[in-house]
Amino acid sequence: MFSTEPRSDTAPGSPSCSETKRRKVRRGTHSCWECKRRKVKCSYSNPSDPRCIGCRRRGTKCLSQQDVDEGASVVSAAVDEDRRIGDRMVRVEALIEQLANQVVNRESEKVVGTNDSESDLATSCSPQDTQTLKHLLPQKVNSPSTCIEYAPVSAALHAALPPHEDINLIIKAGLDVSLHRLMTTSLATLSRCIDGFRAGLAEIPSVDTHPTLLARYLLILATCLQAAHPELHAKEIRCLSEPPRLAMRRLVNAATDLVTSKDELLSSVEGLECVMLESLYLANDGNLRRAWLVCRRAMAVAQLLGLHRVDSQQLPCLTFLSQSVDPRFLWFRIVCTDRQLCLMLGLPQGTPDVSMATESALANDSASGRFERKQCVIASRILERNEASGDFTNDDLATVLKLDEELQQAANEMPSSWWLVPNLASSLHDQNKTIWEMLRLIEQMLYFNLLNLLHLPCMLRARQPA
């Protein structure tokens, strides 16, 4: 127990002890100055110990409250020390916050640097387009922690890149064009942009880029290689380190195994774009069933993200895109691709949604875009007709005639010059013109395919069983 006699590190009877001023304390007071200041229990392991357990553990001087001068100085020094510690903690917190902001800024700069092609689209568009699309700017969902988490995946994807010499040869051959922008950008917007279909192969992503962006680059590169002509690009093909077909398969396999098959990497604009690029590659490669499976997966992910809703919100994005991404347009592209594949494979459609052909949607699109949207709705009704069971009736004939009338009416809205057969040979040296002519040819092909699929089942179906 603490007695009323003073306790200190100085032995009793010494000169320094006798010179210490005393003060009267309340009867029963046993705490030293430090324990009183900290409001903790003051106890001794042995009554003869010069210091209490708390002061011995803290390494502080143990003074009785009877020692006025020294006790006051100790308390004052302790208060000053606490204040200094508090100031240091504030400075440390400020430094940590500053360092964290610097790391985030560096990561953002790296990601933006790997996606200059998206910025090119916005800078090449007119100011009116940029102002109209500002409110649809996607959110960014990238952080240093995610980059660190997926560092091994990014390293594996980066290792799958072909040599820089091969990429330069592909660009030199004029193959730096891709249809991937059609997934996120309307024809009306692309028609007002310079080099809107440029693939951006020159902006090679670094090893610490997010894996979804690396996979996107690999898939775009694979679709560009699909356009390589064995005769027109024979010189460049011979100089490549590996044949284009082997390179395409290797690039797509890497992107599929490491990204598009991982659900956690698909909840963004770029993630959905990767899945649709894989479906596009498979369809162009003749693997329609696999392309349908991949497209249906993209539709399921889009529905989980709420893209099928009329009031769908902005999608999260991995980069600071200057171009905007309309979630409703991305949903329209997924649905349109699904219906075209279902028509060719005889499969039911994934959704009966026809909101892509509302008056507001048609008014904000170009002539080709309106034609494409109307065809998408007619394709949905053809698929519904094909799924209906039972024998062919007069009502079915009336439905076919009505759909034929709507299809012809949509076709008549296009100018007569649009229906001329595109001359791709005359535009070989103009990449932008070539891609637009090819798009016109594809739309014509889809129209006549719809016309055939509308009437052939009626012509081939027997009225009575054989």
Curated annotation (Swiss-Prot):
GO terms for biological process: DNA-templated transcription. The gene is eupR. Residues 1-22 are annotated as: Disordered. Its main location: nucleus. One of its GO terms (cellular component) is nucleus. Pfam families: Fungal_trans, Zn_clus. Residues 1-18 have a biased composition (Polar residues). This is Transcription factor eupR. Disruption phenotype: Abolishes the production of eupenifeldin. Residues 32-62 bind DNA. Transcription factor; part of the gene cluster that mediates the biosynthesis of eupenifeldin, a bistropolone meroterpenoid that acts as an antitumor agent. InterPro entries: Transcription_factor_dom_fun (IPR007219), Zn2-C6_fun-type_DNA-bd_sf (IPR036864), Zn2Cys6_DnaBD (IPR001138). PROSITE patterns: ZN2_CY6_FUNGAL_1 (PS00463), ZN2_CY6_FUNGAL_2 (PS50048). Gene3D superfamilies: Zn(2)-C6 fungal-type DNA-binding domain. GO terms for molecular function: DNA binding; DNA-binding transcription factor activity, RNA polymerase II-specific; zinc ion binding. It comes from the Eukaryota. SUPFAM superfamilies: Zn2/Cys6 DNA-binding domain (SSF57701). It comes from Phoma sp.
